[in-house]
């Protein structure tokens, strides 16, 4: 009798992707975060669907509809906090996933890497439009400030901003379209994630040693399904602790106040996971320059495959580049910290130094260290 999972047209796809997939035998827990991102996406879509059943995308009722969800809907408070903190868990997993890709040289699989960058940008867009929906003070002013950055584009900037707003300021039209975007984008992310997996399975996964493991692969199931399951349980534990014990720790207190266009918050800032890019934006005195630096802070990830000249795969045997890599990680933490501080001395200066260091590390220091290490190998 033929094995159904190997012959059925639909089950065959699942089988080749999650059951009989040849996998390197030595991939560590850092490889768990891809599956965790899939779980985060599913949690966000499901909780978001239930929130959308009770939310109203109207400026007069949006804030009170969120309060209604928390107070009157059965377990509405739990769904809302799982969704809000689920976004934070999503970005934690995303940053670790990208960091692992840089450390172990996964960017050599260029199609997978580039689809990943598109996924990163789409996720950031989804999170941004979602942050506007509760219509609190920081939601409103965050939307105003960030969308207004498009006015820096020469000639078409002003028209483009009004086109996105649907009027002359952030108002009802803006909220309605942001809700529509926030609803559709996760499904686009899901489609891109499948393409991401498709390209990954064309080449096979990388591994910590950076060596070819074709001769020594093992089936994905049961070895890595059980490993992923443990990761998922730990992720759910962390998410439940966050949502049940510290639900507002990552939020902004200003969002407990309904949006008021006549009253500006003392310090406008986005969610914590955008602070590194926000610092880079603020560090450049010129508006257009700041916007370009903001975009480049993410798109610079596409430079990794182009700037890679190393004869070794990954950083496991490369101590010089390892040091530079961890400097980059600390630098990103500094950028995140500065983004949450007011625009005054010494924070502005620290932010400018950290922004310059961020780009210098990736564009200059890493390629130079590659060349030095290549020459050391020849000795």
From Swiss-Prot:
Pfam family, one: Cytochrom_B_C
TM region positions: 33-53, 77-98, 113-133, 178-198, 226-246, 288-308, 320-340, 347-367
Subcellular localization: Mitochondrion inner membrane
Membrane topology: Multi-pass membrane protein
Chief location category: mitochondrion
Biological processes per GO annotation: mitochondrial electron transport, ubiquinol to cytochrome c
InterPro entries: Cyt_b/b6_C (IPR005798), Cyt_b/b6_C_sf (IPR036150), Cyt_b/b6_N (IPR005797), Cytb/b6-like_sf (IPR027387), Cytochrome_b (IPR030689), Cytochrome_b_C_euk/bac (IPR048260), Cytochrome_b_N_euk/bac (IPR048259), Di-haem_cyt_TM (IPR016174)
One function term, GO molecular function aspect: metal ion binding
Keywords in alphabetical order: Electron transport, Heme, Iron, Membrane, Metal-binding, Mitochondrion, Mitochondrion inner membrane, Respiratory chain, Transmembrane, Transmembrane helix, Transport, Ubiquinone
Superkingdom of origin: Eukaryota
Named cofactor requirement(s): heme b
Binding note for cofactor: Binds 2 heme b groups non-covalently.
Any one of the GO CC terms: mitochondrial inner membrane
Additional remarks: Heme 1 (or BL or b562) is low-potential and absorbs at about 562 nm, and heme 2 (or BH or b566) is high-potential and absorbs at about 566 nm.
Protein name according to UniProt: Cytochrome b
């Amino acid at each position: 009798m033929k094995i159904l999972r190997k012959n059925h047209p639909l089950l065959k796809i699942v089988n080749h992707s999650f059951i009989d997939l040849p996998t390197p035998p030595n991939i560590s827990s850092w490889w768990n975060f891809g599956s965790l991102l899939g779980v985060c996406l599913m949690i966000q879509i499901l909780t978001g669907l239930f929130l959308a059943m009770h939310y109203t995308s109207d400026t007069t009722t949006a804030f009170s509809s969120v309060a209604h969800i928390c107070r009157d809907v059965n377990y509405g408070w739990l769904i809302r906090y799982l969704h809000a903190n689920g976004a934070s868990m999503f970005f934690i997993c995303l940053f670790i996933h990208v960091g692992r890709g840089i450390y172990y040289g996964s960017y050599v699989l260029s199609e997978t890497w580039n689809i990943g960058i598109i996924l990163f940008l789409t996720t950031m867009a989804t999170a941004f439009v979602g942050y506007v929906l509760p219509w609190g003070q920081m939601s409103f002013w965050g939307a105003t400030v960030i969308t207004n950055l498009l006015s820096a584009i020469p000639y078409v900037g002003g028209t483009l901003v009004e086109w996105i707003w649907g009027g002359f300021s952030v108002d009802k039209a803006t909220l309605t379209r942001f809700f529509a975007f926030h609803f559709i984008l996760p499904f686009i992310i899901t489609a891109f994630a499948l393409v991401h997996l498709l390209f990954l399975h064309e080449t096979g996964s990388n591994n910590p040693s950076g060596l070819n493991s074709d001769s020594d692969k093992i089936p994905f199931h049961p070895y890595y399904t059980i490993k992923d399951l443990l990761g998922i349980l730990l992720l759910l534990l962390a998410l439940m602790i966050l949502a049940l014990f510290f639900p507002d720790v990552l939020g902004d207190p200003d969002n407990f106040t309904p949006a008021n266009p006549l009253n500006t918050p003392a310090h406008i800032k986005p969610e914590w996971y955008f602070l590194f890019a926000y610092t880079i934006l603020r560090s450049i005195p010129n508006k257009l320059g700041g916007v370009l630096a903001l975009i480049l802070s993410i798109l610079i990830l596409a430079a990794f495959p182009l700037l890679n000249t190393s004869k070794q795969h990954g950083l496991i045997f490369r101590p010089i580049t390892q040091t530079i890599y961890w400097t980059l990680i600390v630098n990103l933490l500094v950028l995140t910290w500065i983004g949450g501080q007011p625009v005054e001395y010494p924070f502005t200066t620290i932010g400018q130094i950290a922004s310059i260091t961020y780009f210098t590390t990736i564009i200059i220091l890493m390629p130079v260290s590659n060349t030095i290490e290549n020459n050391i190998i020849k000795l």
